[in-house]
Amino acid sequence: MRCLSKKHQKQGDEHGGEIPLPNPDEGTIICGVVRHLGGDYLIAKCLDGVDRKIRIPGKLRRKVWITEGDIILVGLWDFSSEKGEVVYKYGKNEVNKLVEKGVVPKEFIDALSELI
């Protein structure tokens, strides 16, 4: 068993080994990053076909680098469905699992790569 620092142990246990999925009741949706606007804002194309202005919260901004083409889980704001904030960034392996499960269509990934 490897001995990991507290920082690395915490990162692995954050979601209990499960990939967080979108939940319409909680107001979350999967989006793909189209471009950075500067600061902590970006434009993302969501699965419902809407382009949204997304904010990267401070706790993620310092830990996770979000670049164009990344697939993210977004929590929509209650008072404005055109805006939201990043909840989770999916890794490449997680995106492949989401495609296998049918949560994200392969066409969405292909269309996102063409936009960039």
Swiss-Prot record:
Gene3D superfamilies: Nucleic acid-binding proteins
Keyword match Protein biosynthesis: yes
SMART domains with a match to the protein in the record: eIF1a
CDD domains assigned to the protein according to its UniProt record, in alphabetical order: S1_IF1A
Pfam family, one: eIF-1a
GO molecular function: RNA binding; translation initiation factor activity
Keywords, alphabetical: Initiation factor, Protein biosynthesis
Segments of this protein annotated with the region Disordered: 1-25
PROSITE patterns: S1_IF1_TYPE (PS50832)
Domain S1-like residue range list: 17-91
InterPro entries assigned: NA-bd_OB-fold, RNA-binding_domain_S1_IF1, TIF_eIF-1A
Known function: Seems to be required for maximal rate of protein biosynthesis. Enhances ribosome dissociation into subunits and stabilizes the binding of the initiator Met-tRNA(I) to 40 S ribosomal subunits.
PANTHER family according to UniProt: EIF-1A
Family: Belongs to the eIF-1A family.
The name this protein goes by in its record: Translation initiation factor 1A
Organism: Desulfurococcus amylolyticus (strain DSM 18924 / JCM 16383 / VKM B-2413 / 1221n)
